[in-house]
Regions:
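Flexible, low-complexity linker and terminal segments
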Residues: 2-48, 281-289, 295-438, 445
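Cofactor-binding active-site loop characterized by glycine-rich and histidine/acidic residues
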Residues: 50, 55-80, 88-91, 96-238, ...
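Non-catalytic terminal/interface segments that mediate subunit docking, oligomerization
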Residues: 52, 66-74, 120, 375-532
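Short, surface-exposed connector motifs at secondary-structure boundaries
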Residues: 86, 113-117, 212-213, 277-279, ...
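Structured core elements
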Residues: 121, 282, 319-321, 439-442, ...
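Short internal beta-strands
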Residues: 121-123, 241-251, 441, 538-540
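Thiamine diphosphate
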Residues: 170-244, 293, 448-556
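Glycine-rich ThDP/TPP pyrophosphate-binding loop and its adjacent helix/strand module
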Residues: 179-372, 546-556
Length: 556
């Protein structure tokens, strides 16, 4: 299709199970006009070609995801698979991964439309098959995967066979560069995503000024982890990059519908978000074009706010509700079974399941030449002089080592408070490193823990400071009676300087989040990719040997 009119018709028609609602078409057409007027893209024909390409890449990636669960190989000619082509024991979080494909391809589309590479964060790490399938198709794989996974039939078949193969090398470590969750071998990943709710706590603290992040969130995590609704309370244009949260609202957990759907679905969630300072928008989560539109619009909203000279906080923070069904685009969608194995039976052993699989794969099939053209169109990195998605800045954090002031050592045989000494030294550390953004995770006890000077210097971050209290609109101390939420602020700030202070017993609530960070960092070191961020101290106080003021309530 060479004419602009044909290109427009082509993308509007959708592809396979992907259809574009009239609302999505109108929204994207308006955005394309604006991008052309702002010279962010050359012309409408270029934009339309990208939109059509995204549909085809998404369909192919969804097919690869289904194959990763059930099959031993893929046939890129589209021929149906026989019984021996299927795994004896299929495994994979298929439904969520299928839903993540349009979302992740929509993220790629947004980058291609605007000529900028954003970072990404996925809370539902068990949906890694979606990322790996798309990365293999685009060729944007990690160093360990290079030469093993690509978009050839052989390369995709290796990816498919390796998934949940449980292969172990002679050292007892995974023998293939592919895991059940996002990891350092997942190109561009910055978090394991094993705990669904932690991405919702971290995303607003992750990008530095000048950066942009897209965070894919789980609707199941909405009921698992509290604290994500405070993002508008923490975001500041002066020291934060842009962040776009996208909830994949597929409505199902493992055994039943999510609480959101039971309460009223997307409309109910949108109302709840408005009460917490968000500006939600509901889109078609089955459509990569809708995802891309929402990303660009949300980012532009934050950019317009940042350009104002008379900013007042909190900002009405954009929040994207991507409404879909569990396992979209494949047989078994919208059922509880879609969470893991959507087909009714193993295709290796059951003819009916095999027929359903082959029919589902056929509906998603994209001919080789058409797929190659689509991938070439999306790969405009060189043309726009932008990095590949795996090289986004948040995936390559290496801040310069901080200047470490000499501590004011206390003379021997003189009693004193260790916390007070730490307090004095941390003040000097923060003052000596103004180039590093500081985040203090504080569950409301910093002064009680004898760090009053640190609090006086850095201050609680609030929207409206109270006179006479160490508070500031731009404070660096993230304070809330939620240990995970405040620890997340420090752990997400990998381009800066961080500290977490808590009572011993309360610190236990942070262990899941800290465990996830340690696992990811440990795997990076094992793979010869040691993390470059500055170590984050976690100080716990009120030990049993220290005092008995609160008995064992504040102690372990």
């Amino acid at each position: 299709m060479s004419s602009q009119a044909n290109l427009a018709t082509d993308w509007r028609a959708g592809y396979g199970p992907i259809a574009h609602r009239s609302e999505t078409i109108e929204r994207m057409q308006a955005l394309v006009h604006r991008l052309v007027a702002q010279r962010r893209i050359a012309d409408e024909a270029s934009a339309h070609a990208l939109l059509a390409a995204a549909d085809r890449v998404a369909c192919t990636a969804m097919s690869v995801v289904a194959h990763m669960t059930y099959a031993r190989r893929i046939d890129r000619s589209g021929r149906p698979l026989g019984s021996d082509d299927f795994k004896q024991t299929p495994e994979g979080h298929t439904g969520g991964s299928l839903d993540m494909v349009p979302a992740f391809v929509g993220y790629l589309l947004a980058n291609a439309l605007t000529g900028t590479t954003r970072g990404w964060l996925m809370g539902q790490g068990h949906c890694v098959a979606a990322i790996e399938a798309v990365n293999a198709l685009t060729g944007d794989v990690s160093a360990a995967q290079r030469g093993r996974y690509d978009r050839s039939e052989a390369g995709l078949s290796r990816l498919i066979a390796d998934f949940y193969s449980y292969a172990i090398d002679k050292q007892g470590r995974p023998a293939v560069p592919l895991g059940s969750h996002a990891g350092p071998n997942t190109a561009g990943a910055i978090s394991e995503g094993g705990y669904l709710g932690f991405a919702g706590l971290q995303y607003v603290h992750t990008p530095l000024p000048g950066e942009s992040l897209v965070a894919f969130l789980s609707d199941g995590a909405f009921e698992e982890q509290r604290g994500s609704d405070w993002a508008p309370r923490w975001w500041r244009a002066e020291d934060c990059g842009f962040a776009v949260p996208i909830m994949i609202l597929n409505g199902r957990r493992i055994e039943q519908r999510t609480q959101i759907v039971q309460e009223g679905g997307a409309a109910w969630l949108a109302e709840d978000l408005r009460h917490n300072g968000f500006d939600p928008v509901i889109i078609d989560g089955r459509d990569p074009v809708a995802i891309a539109w929402a990303i660009v619009e949300s980012e532009d909203t934050l950019s317009a706010f940042a350009a104002q000279s008379n900013r007042r906080y909190p900002v009405k923070f954009p929040y994207v509700i991507a409404e879909t069904e569990k396992g979209f685009g494949f047989p078994g969608a919208a059922t509880n079974a879609a969470h893991n194995l959507p087909l009714d039976g193993n295709p290796r052993e059951h003819a009916q399941a095999r027929e359903a699989f082959n029919a589902g794969a056929a509906a998603l099939f994209v001919p080789e030449i058409e797929l190659e053209n689509a991938l070439t169109v999306l790969a405009n990195h060189g043309k726009n002089r932008r990095s590949r998605e795996s090289e986004h800045p948040m995936a390559r954090r290496h801040p310069a080592s901080p200047h470490l002031p000499v501590p004011a050592w206390a003379p021997t045989k003189v009693s004193g408070s260790a916390m007070s000494s730490l307090d004095r030294w941390f003040v000097k550390l923060a003052q000596a490193n103004p180039q590093l953004r500081v985040r203090i995770g504080n569950p409301d006890e910093l002064a009680s823990n004898k760090m009053g000077a640190t609090l006086a210097l850095l201050k609680h971050r609030v929207n409206v400071p109270e006179p006479g209290v160490p508070e500031s609109t731009h404070g660096s101390v993230i304070t809330a009676l939620n240990e995970e939420a405040v620890a997340a602020a420090a752990l997400a700030n990998k381009g800066g300087l961080n500290l977490i202070v808590s009572y011993e017993a309360f610190a236990v609530k942070m262990l899941g989040l800290i465990r996830q960070e340690i696992i990811f960092a440990r795997r990076q070191k094992e793979l010869g990719q040691p993390p470059g961020w500055i170590s984050i101290p976690l100080v716990v106080t009120s030990h049993t040997w220290e005092n008995s003021k609160n008995e064992q309530s504040h102690q372990d």
